Amino acid sequence: MDHIYICRFFSIPNTIKTKNKSHTCPDLSGAGSFFIPFGSNLPKPESINFLRGYGIWGAIDRLGIPKFLQKDLNSSTGFLIAHGEVLPREENSVSLSKRTDKWGIPIPHIEFKWSENELNMAKHMESTIRDSIEAADGDIRGIDELIKIPYVGLFTEKSIALSGNPPPPGYYIHEVGGAAMGFNEEESVVNKLNQLWRCSNVLVLDGACWPTSSWQSPTLTMMAISRRACLNIKKT
């Protein structure tokens, strides 16, 4: 699994009345951005035609674009990136290919595509992003409309990440679920404490052990799962 996502850049009327925004705007980071969880001001549940949810990461004037490259000094530049949960499906799988690498080891063969559920979610993401930007008196813009870089349009117009459709699986590099945990050996690779069923001293601690992608960014959850597994080793 990987997160399905939609990314949009935008401009809004200047939010900070100062000659030097760098004094008040930190660099893009966890503290210099915001996150909108799924669930706020939703319409009635029956109008949602997909399972699970998504969140929206964004920031305004945190991209560090030098003033001389900005096309409109009277506006602020921002972005919104929605990423959502992908449901585990038997059709999405990893197996060994007949092809081998230069050491003669079979390479992974990955079967993975978005389902109707994810594509419906992506449409809802797009609608929510547009509504959010409009509510802030903003306009969705292409990169070439925001910054002055020669020929940037030649690259962005073919960018998969900035296209109207969600990029293919693997593009967001939040891959998880290749060795999922579960309740028994027949349906999973590791147990609830991340141990291989037949070799308890081998642990899978990265995103491979996840039975679902959830919609949050995976790093902190990976750290928490790793800590729990290590505490269990210490205890036993």
Placement of each model-derived feature along the sequence:
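FAD cofactor-binding and catalytic pocket of flavoenzymes
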Residues: 1-120, 164, 169-175, 197, ...
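Glycine-rich loop(s) and the adjacent beta-strand/alpha-helix scaffold that form part
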Residues: 1-15, 206, 221, 225, ...
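Generic structural signal for well-ordered, non-membrane alpha-helical segments
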Residues: 5, 118-122, 126, 219-222
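A glycine-rich dinucleotide-binding beta-alpha-beta segment and adjacent secondary-structure elements
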Residues: 75-81, 124-213, 219
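Generic, well-ordered alpha-helical scaffold segments in large soluble proteins
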Residues: 99, 125-136, 229-236
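Glycine-rich loops and low-complexity Gly/Arg-rich segments
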Residues: 104-109, 119-122, 135-137, 205-207, ...
